Amino acid sequence: MDQTLSDFGNVFVFLLLGVVFVAGGYLTARMLRPSRPNPVKNSTYECGEEAVGSSWVKFNIRFYVVALIFIIFDVEVVFLFPWATVFRQLGSFALIEALVFAGILILGLVYAWVKGDLDWVRPTPSVPKMPEMPSPRQSAGRD
């Protein structure tokens, strides 16, 4: 138990030193940098060309959803590749773990599919039109 606690202590000290190192570098750079804002520095840079239009463009959320799904399955490959290289040494328990891992990701993919996040062209919802009813004034004149 003491050895395990000591190992976690080493990891904690390493993480703490990493955070201190990054925060110290960030704060030092922020204190030492000159602050000279001007319109040229704040303008949009387009590979040396003059910017056309606004840089604030709305992107469709579907791009982000597709990118997130790609990243999820890309990370799955990163996790499954080392498992596949040592499959024979790990035995059947590791196979079951890998199948559960892949199954959870497939369930997430099916959920995204059923929800419609994978449909690139979605049908636009149409608002049903109400049938026109005669106004009370029109119906009163017919009597």
Curated annotation (Swiss-Prot):
Membrane-protein topology: Multi-pass membrane protein
Catalytic reactions of this protein: a quinone + NADH + 5 H(+)(in) = a quinol + NAD(+) + 4 H(+)(out)
Subcellular location: Cell inner membrane
Gene Ontology CC terms, in alphabetical order: NADH dehydrogenase complex; plasma membrane
Keywords, ordered alphabetically: Cell inner membrane, Cell membrane, Membrane, NAD, Quinone, Translocase, Transmembrane, Transmembrane helix, Transport
Sequence intervals crossing the membrane: 8-28, 63-83, 93-113
Top enzyme category: translocase
GO molecular function: NADH dehydrogenase (ubiquinone) activity; NADH:ubiquinone reductase (non-electrogenic) activity; quinone binding
EC number: 7.1.1.-
Superkingdom in the source lineage: Bacteria
InterPro entries hit by this protein: NAD(P)H_OxRDtase_bac/plastid, NADH_UbQ/plastoQ_OxRdtase_su3, NDAH_ubi_oxred_su3_sf
Family, similarity comment: Belongs to the complex I subunit 3 family.
HAMAP family given in the database record: NDH1_NuoA (MF_01394)
Assembly and interaction partners: NDH-1 is composed of 14 different subunits. Subunits NuoA, H, J, K, L, M, N constitute the membrane sector of the complex.
Job description of the protein: NDH-1 shuttles electrons from NADH, via FMN and iron-sulfur (Fe-S) centers, to quinones in the respiratory chain. The immediate electron acceptor for the enzyme in this species is believed to be a menaquinone. Couples the redox reaction to proton translocation (for every two electrons transferred, four hydrogen ions are translocated across the cytoplasmic membrane), and thus conserves the redox energy in a proton gradient.
Name of the molecule in the record: NADH-quinone oxidoreductase subunit A
